[in-house]
Amino acid sequence: MDKKAREYAQDALKFIQRSGSNFLACKNLKERLENNGFINLSEGETWNLNKNEGYVLCKENRNICGFFVGKNFNIDTGSILISIGHIDSCALKISPNNNVIKKKIHQINVECYGSGLWHTWFDRSLGLSGQVLYKKGNKLVEKLIQINKSVLFLPSLAIHLQNRTRYDFSVKINYENHIKPIISTTLFNQLNKCKRNNVHHDTILTTDTKFSHKENSQNKRDDQMCHSFNDKDVSNHNLDKNTIEHLTNQQNEEKNKHTKDNPNSKDIVEHINTDNSYPLLYLLSKELNCKEEDILDFELCLMDTQEPCFTGVYEEFIEGARFDNLLGSFCVFEGFIELVNSIKNHTSNENTNHTNNITNDINDNIHNNLYISIGYDHEEIGSLSEVGARSYCTKNFIDRIISSVFKKEIHEKNLSVQEIYGNLVNRSFILNVDMAHCSHPNYPETVQDNHQLFFHEGIAIKYNTNKNYVTSPLHASLIKRTFELYYNKYKQQIKYQNFMVKNDTPCGSTVGSMVAANLSMPGIDIGIPQLAMHSIREIAAVHDVFFLIKGVFAFYTYYNQVLSTCVHDK
């Protein structure tokens, strides 16, 4: 198990490093499914689905759904087994109007997404990841990018400048005033522009000019007028008359050229967006190989460029960003892929096994079901969006699958999609995976003594009688039994531990209850322990990754078998 656990953890870290945002996580999970034989679908096309086949669907590059239709999927004995997670994480996202200039420094205005431990983002090497929209000829192009090198930083205030006693932690961070990452100085921004325009800039290097603008966010327009030249943020104070005249002529020629080539673009060309930081646009234009003025909008997350890694003297831990919940979602999809591969192997080998009287690794009724794995966006901010868990996208996906797979039954027996769904839902189940809180050795008072979570002790089964978690004793027992059946077959234990928050502590919530309510389907909330949740650098244990992946696999493989043995004692 040690070797396999490390392999799983290594794969998870590689995935997380490549997934600096929700967009890239969706893209990378989609590629992972396609590499395992899943067929790509689009919402805007007619679905002609086949049994014993896997499919993958992305909605707006924010929500990913993989599913596999069992070869004997049927109305009478089949079920819908769903494992879910969320692919967003707390992050600093660049604002639409992000141009900030203070003390001869270009900064970026950002917005706090979710409830992050924002003080941990200070003094880190920050890159960018996300979605950019730009013009290319007559087309509007969406591009997903990730810049893994350090292009931004958020400096702390030096200890000597803080009005504090030696026992204070630090200055209190104001999220509006203090979280504005630095991208460049105004000097180097001007030098770069002059270099690109083949203009001599010796005067800039020898001039020590005080800027006359008011460094106040309420006077940003005045700021831009003092700092920008022809709406391109070139300082008039630092350029001589010839340089100004040269730049004016060059920009007018460029504008006239664009207008002449495309008369319809006149209004667009004449409007140069000064609300966006020019150094940021320059960076993005290099990445996209386009012009700055062609960039229309973006959704970009700041990300830590330091790679995740194994840690601890025995390398029993892993550390990195976005474990909540990319680590959980990786385990969801990995367990799902392993299940599908085992079904395919079972199908291809069952005739040979029957002839040679070989016992199959999995039970035959595993072919009777529809298996689904989903990664939602926007969990960190409440899930209320078209790609979040509160939407009806999951129910829409299931309805479309039923309509395609049971097309013949619907026509010949005059059945409705809702009738078929109503028959299936009674045997169906949701397994929601989201990270959990490990007992912190430095803050032992934060957890209930009877419900502590420990590293290497396995999956956390989350309970909350106020339904912040969807778990009930009945359904927790069903899942625990699947773990036992997995052990009976493979002789590998899937450890688990029960979790509940203190009565005097607010209980976090996740998407399990939301999806269960939308689908009228029972479920359970699970996860694995981690420390420093919502920090830019989080900690988890290697062996728990193994337990979670195998737990998802066991759920898919044995849930129906366990459910069939469940009886009510009269």
UniProtKB/Swiss-Prot annotation:
Q: Which branch of life, at top level?
A: Eukaryota
Task: Please state how the activity of this protein depends on pH.
Answer: Optimum pH is 7.5.
Gene behind this chain?
M18AAP
Binding positions for Zn(2+) 1?
A: H86, D324, D434
Keywords for this entry?
A: Aminopeptidase, Cytoplasm, Hydrolase, Metal-binding, Metalloprotease, Protease, Zinc
Its EC number(s): 3.4.11.21
Report the sequence similarity comment from the record.
Belongs to the peptidase M18 family.
Q: How is its activity regulated?
A: Activated by Co(2+). Inhibited by high concentrations (>1mM) of Zn(2+).
Query: What positions does the entry give for Zn(2+) 2 binding?
Result: D324, E380, H534
Question: InterPro entries, per this entry?
Answer: Peptidase_M18 (IPR001948), Peptidase_M18_dom2 (IPR023358)
Does Zinc count among this protein's keywords? yes
**Self-association or partners: how does it assemble?**
Homododecamer composed of homodimers and homotrimers that assemble into a tetrahedron shape to create a central tunnel containing the active sites. Homooctamer.
Location relative to the cell:
Cytoplasm
Catalysed reaction(s) here are:
Release of an N-terminal aspartate or glutamate from a peptide, with a preference for aspartate
* Residues binding substrate: H160, E379, D434, H437, K462, Y469
Q: Example GO biological process term?
A: proteolysis
GO cellular component terms?
A: cytoplasm
Null mutant: what phenotype?
RNAi-mediated knockdown causes a loss in aspartyl aminopeptidase activity, the rupture of the food vacuole in ring and schizonts and an accumulation of large lipid droplets and host hemoglobin in trophozoites.
Give the protein name, as stated in the record.
Aspartyl aminopeptidase
Function, as annotated, reads:
Aminopeptidase which specifically catalyzes the removal of glutamic acid or aspartic acid residues from the N-terminus of peptides. May play a role in the final step of host hemoglobin catabolism, by cleaving hemoglobin-derived oligopeptides in the cytoplasm.
Entry cofactor note text?
A: Binds 2 Zn(2+) ions per subunit.
Q: Name one GO molecular function term.
A: zinc ion binding
